[in-house]
């Protein structure tokens, strides 16, 4: 990465020295609280039989939250110090480690988003054939592979940065010569941004094309069923992937502009650099907001963290289990085998059977639109 990333142009009393700590403090607090709540939601124990098993999407979201939390905890405070202070105060080891963690977590996030997009594509395009592949065990193996690849791609950054003396000050700056730095920065853009974004775009694009490829009324009904099958989780992960592309795009564009364009050192270019970093770092605190807004399932699980939410959920599932105990096991009305009943109908006991004291007969009765 370019030298300009790690040399502050502002003095401690300037506007930048005041604004940067405030912006980074907000990113730090929101990211810690938001991703901490995501971990709490996904790691909450299953005290009863109605707790659903952890899905592959849950495991990938959990991995994203871990990567974001590591980034915010280990990187954001030190980057704020780089922008605020005139010198690097933490030594050569921390200088190398912080920048290694920045790229390690960036690669982990981008590769995880690519894995999620492929998982969603298989779930929609090949729901039956991919069932044996899309298991929690294989998802954990995929997460391990993501971190292994992230470690391999980010390993060069352990020697990329170092500390140098500049008069009486010690600075944390790139230590490689320009040719090697340019090659690594371009490789990081290609492998850590361009390739994952291309995979995500292709996977979600093919998924959407498949969902909307309906011919005739039967095809439209099948497409609608498939769209419902994707659920809000798929839309939430699509929003997360789009946010990643939008937040990290200016950061990589600025680096490429530095190497291949005209990048004069000025307050304007410094402001662009600062804005691109703030936008990239803010990506780690925006994902929990997307989950809470786009996923009704996530909000329901979040409410279970609190005593009142657990009581409501337990009461709901007790009623659901009671209904299932009286539900026929094998047949429904003509044309709706098993439990495949049309929306707007419910299983209810006939009132005359209850009044007569005889055997309860279950019939389908209209509930009205939902």
Swiss-Prot record:
Membrane topology category: Multi-pass membrane protein
Pfam families: 7tm_1 (PF00001)
Lipid moiety-binding region (S-palmitoyl cysteine): 308
Record topological domains on the Cytoplasmic side: 42-57, 119-138, 206-236, 281-370
Glycosylated residues in this chain: 6
GO cellular component, one term: plasma membrane
Source superkingdom: Eukaryota
Residue ranges, Extracellular side: 1-20, 79-96, 160-184, 258-259
Coiled coil (residue ranges): none
Name of the protein in its database record: Galanin receptor type 3
Chief location category: membrane
Transmembrane segments: 21-41, 58-78, 97-118, 139-159, 185-205, 237-257, 260-280
PANTHER family per the UniProt record, alphabetical: GALANIN RECEPTOR 3, LEUCOKININ RECEPTOR-RELATED
Protein family according to the UniProt entry: Belongs to the G-protein coupled receptor 1 family.
This protein's record includes keyword Metal-binding: no
Keywords: Cell membrane, Disulfide bond, G-protein coupled receptor, Glycoprotein, Lipoprotein, Membrane, Palmitate, Receptor, Transducer, Transmembrane, Transmembrane helix
Residue numbers spanned by region Disordered: 317-370
SS bond list: 95-172
Compartment(s): Cell membrane
